[in-house]
């Protein structure tokens, strides 16, 4: 494979020296970019875009043409695994993702296959290989998956949810069925991420978007336990280089110590966690990624710069920080504000690296 020209993102995840703090944005390939909207229209719909390696590659690269980002992230969706399990994924206008055949009981769980990543999910691996080829070693490529708990919420609720009553009913009334589902998902995610690594992903991230809706005890049992199993099963080296793993639980700021015990290399933070506090608590064990409120990108560039400066000062001197938003970029953010954000991170962070 081509030698990496810019590896500061990988170095920061391993708490190694860098010249400036690396930066990328969750959902950096997305609807805030007019060129993304044009490519998506060309694809016809969202899943057709995900399943076409050339177009998925095109949208992955679009933000890198605009901004000097330090990493590319595979353009895909967290629901590829449940889709490959045969749940009938579709997107309802204004409603988000839905499943025609949600999981309602242990009998449904028993019938679910564990997808072969090079077969049912081969389109994702094709996209990874295509993106790596087209990146020409400019920056590393991040692969990702949803966490078992987060995937299970969609599969059991039948789509997005606000209160999570359906999955919580299963969790409290039939925990055995839910554990069986989570175990199957943990095996599937491990295979899926390892296949992405073999196809060329240089770092992987597990998105636990809905872990924060759980009590501390339930988080440990139903979310973190299964992410830990995945981390234990991942390929940690490929192409002669360490493959860093980042865990991100939205709303998980109170559980950072337990998350850092999983053996991951980095933790993602949302904007409700104070980064200085997070570094005091776990900075000796893991790198930290985050954590500007994505809504800050609606502010004028001077205010964005002020927020970047505050977060950099909060993390302080030294290594182990990847700058990011605390969750995905909103679809109506002005693209030039995203540009001001990226530029400010690089310009203002050099003083923190000797």
UniProtKB/Swiss-Prot annotation:
The answer, when asked if Cytoplasm is one of the entry's keywords, is yes
Site (Transition state stabilizer) at: 77
A biological process (GO) of this protein is: protoporphyrinogen IX biosynthetic process from glutamate
Report the superkingdom from the record: Bacteria
Repeat in keyword set: no
Q: Which Pfam families match?
A: URO-D
Please report the name of this protein according to its UniProt entry. Uroporphyrinogen decarboxylase
Residues annotated to bind substrate: 27-31, 77, 154, 209, 327
- Name the enzyme's class: lyase
Q: List keywords of the entry alphabetically.
A: Cytoplasm, Decarboxylase, Lyase, Porphyrin biosynthesis
Query: What is its quaternary makeup?
Result: Homodimer.
**According to its record, what are the GO cellular component terms?**
cytosol
Reactions the enzyme catalyzes: uroporphyrinogen III + 4 H(+) = coproporphyrinogen III + 4 CO2
> Which GO molecular-function terms appear in the entry?
uroporphyrinogen decarboxylase activity
The entry's family comment says: Belongs to the uroporphyrinogen decarboxylase family.
Q: Which Gene3D superfamilies does the record match to this protein? A: 3.20.20.210
Question: What EC number(s) would the UniProt record show?
Answer: 4.1.1.37
Q: What does this protein do?
A: Catalyzes the decarboxylation of four acetate groups of uroporphyrinogen-III to yield coproporphyrinogen-III.
Q: Where in or outside the cell is it found?
A: Cytoplasm
Pathway it works in: Porphyrin-containing compound metabolism; protoporphyrin-IX biosynthesis; coproporphyrinogen-III from 5-aminolevulinate: step 4/4
């Amino acid at each position: 494979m081509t030698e990496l020209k810019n590896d500061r993102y990988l170095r920061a995840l391993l708490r190694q020296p860098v010249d400036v703090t690396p930066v990328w944005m969750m959902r950096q390939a997305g609807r805030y970019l007019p060129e993304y909207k044009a490519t998506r229209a060309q694809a016809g719909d969202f899943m057709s875009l995900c399943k076409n390696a050339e177009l998925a590659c095109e949208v992955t690269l679009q933000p890198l043409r605009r901004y000097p980002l330090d990493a590319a992230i595979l353009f895909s969706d967290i629901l590829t695994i449940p889709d490959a399990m045969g749940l009938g994924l579709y997107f309802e206008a204004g409603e988000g993702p839905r499943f025609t055949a949600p999981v309602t009981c242990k009998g449904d769980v028993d019938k679910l296959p564990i997808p072969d990543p090079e077969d049912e999910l081969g389109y994702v691996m094709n996209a990874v290989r295509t993106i790596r080829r087209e990146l020409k070693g400019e920056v590393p490529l991040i692969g990702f998956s949803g966490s078992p708990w987060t995937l299970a919420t969609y599969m059991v609720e039948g789509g997005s949810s606000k209160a999570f009553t359906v999955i919580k009913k299963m969790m409290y009334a039939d925990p055995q069925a839910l554990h069986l589902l989570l175990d199957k998902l943990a095996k599937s995610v491990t295979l899926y991420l390892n296949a992405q690594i073999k196809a060329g992903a240089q770092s992987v991230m597990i998105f636990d978007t809905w872990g924060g809706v759980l009590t501390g005890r339930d988080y440990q049992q139903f979310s973190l336990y299964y992410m830990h199993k995945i981390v234990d099963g991942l390929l940690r080296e490929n192409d002669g280089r360490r493959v860093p793993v980042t865990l991100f639980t939205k709303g998980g700021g109170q559980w950072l110590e337990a998350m850092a015990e999983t053996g991951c290399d980095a933790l993602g933070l949302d904007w409700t966690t104070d980064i200085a506090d997070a570094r005091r608590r776990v900075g000796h064990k893991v790198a930290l990624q985050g954590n500007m409120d994505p809504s800050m990108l609606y502010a004028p560039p001077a205010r964005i710069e002020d927020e970047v400066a505050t977060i950099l000062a909060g993390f302080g001197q030294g290594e182990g920080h990847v700058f990011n938003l605390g969750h995905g970029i909103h679809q109506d953010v002005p693209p030039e504000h995203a540009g001001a954000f990226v530029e400010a991170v690089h310009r203002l962070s050099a003083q923190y690296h000797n």
